[in-house]
């Protein structure tokens, strides 16, 4: 018979009591009332925060956007096909955040920072809030460094600085994405991290951009965030904020970044869809009242940081699509008022063969020459003036039958200047090449050439300078000034090269 030892039992009980830890898990839970169209109505969740992450029992996540007296409106970050009425929901106590890090360079990811390029997982230990606050006034400094796009029309007349927000606006099929991707390609030697955010695009269009970046060796310093046209509205709405969080990570690491949002019209449409399904009151063009705040809090995150924070920068190039050139619509006017200038792409110019189809007359950079090197300022001011005079005279010449010789010369010069602004896609020019082209145009060296010959002549002249007069590029790159020596090289080279070009053309 087993003897019961009271002291042993009491020791065991005492030991258990000593090692007992009182652990109570308090969960903020709720019940699914209604689900459909990417929106879930939930009863309960009494202490949920606006913007808090919500987790459903089958694993789908959502964001609490509408906090009402009787229920909570949640937008789903996924299809939510397995969510049922009466299902359990819990609040996570966290605001949406994404992993960030150098490992994301060269990868294609979605709005939740999950890779979609089939190249395996991305390991990262750091996280940033998707919707983090913009730097304050004291955290910034004024813009003074140029961000070269490689496009002669932009770098000379609509200069962009590091930390600026410059809108690219135009109708569909006018080359907006081409301007943005060419700018990414031009950063290869500039040590700038690029983030390209595709919102609601066709998968084939995004694949084309990724292929171009890969072929040109630009994907290694670029992160592509893509949410296609068939993605949930919530993910299309979140994609730009994810891109901004990744760019901010590098900015605060004292690096220079460039972010392209392609395009914010589609983000606004996704947000409108979410808001209408959440029964928020519609305003102008059925957009909700806070659609301005949607874009302002995103674009204000672009900044040139102060010297105390390391002088990193985040330059934003948002893209907005217009309908039939109407820039007075709601979203275009909103984004124009938030940004530091706009590059307007015209369908008429595009169809007339001027590509990139930049309408220099109504495009503007509010940072201006502060974002230009001295060498470019020296040659670009005359180019602006002559093109403005040409545009005025061209409009007048449509009604006048006979023009005096001076006016005819001005028209001929203007046509040649407009011709030198033409560029092939994915062929950005260096600053030295741009200065050479502008100098040749404004000083009349191109006046005796046919319009069709100008592009070929400038390419040959550039090749000749690179091989035989490398000193010209050295001067521009090192001094950032168009010195007398640099001008003497051009004065000596252009006439002799033009004579050779014309002789060869006649043979």
Swiss-Prot record:
Subcellular location: Plastid membrane
Keyword Coiled coil (UniProt): no
Record text on subunit structure and interactions: F-type ATPases have 2 components, CF(1) - the catalytic core - and CF(0) - the membrane proton channel. CF(1) has five subunits: alpha(3), beta(3), gamma(1), delta(1), epsilon(1). CF(0) has four main subunits: a, b, b' and c.
Family listed: Belongs to the ATPase alpha/beta chains family.
InterPro entries hit by this protein: ATP_synth_asu-like_sf, ATP_synth_asu_C, ATP_synth_asu_C_sf, ATP_synth_F1_a_nt-bd_dom, ATP_synth_F1_asu, ATPase_a/bsu_AS, ATPase_F1/V1/A1_a/bsu_N, ATPase_F1/V1/A1_a/bsu_N_sf
UniProt keyword annotations, A-Z: ATP synthesis, ATP-binding, CF(1), Hydrogen ion transport, Ion transport, Membrane, Nucleotide-binding, Plastid, Translocase, Transport
Protein name from the UniProt record: ATP synthase subunit alpha, plastid
PANTHER family: ATP SYNTHASE SUBUNIT ALPHA, MITOCHONDRIAL
Site description Required for activity, residues in chain: 363
Membrane topology per record: Peripheral membrane protein
Protein purpose: Produces ATP from ADP in the presence of a proton gradient across the membrane. The alpha chain is a regulatory subunit.
Lineage of producing organism: Eukaryota, Viridiplantae, Streptophyta, Embryophyta, Tracheophyta
Entry's Gene Ontology molecular function annotations: ADP binding; ATP binding; proton-transporting ATP synthase activity, rotational mechanism
Cellular component annotations (GO), alphabetically ordered: plastid membrane; proton-transporting ATP synthase complex
Binding site for ATP: 170-177
Catalytic activity: ATP + H2O + 4 H(+)(in) = ADP + phosphate + 5 H(+)(out)
EC number from the UniProt entry: 7.1.2.2
UniProt main location, coarse: plastid
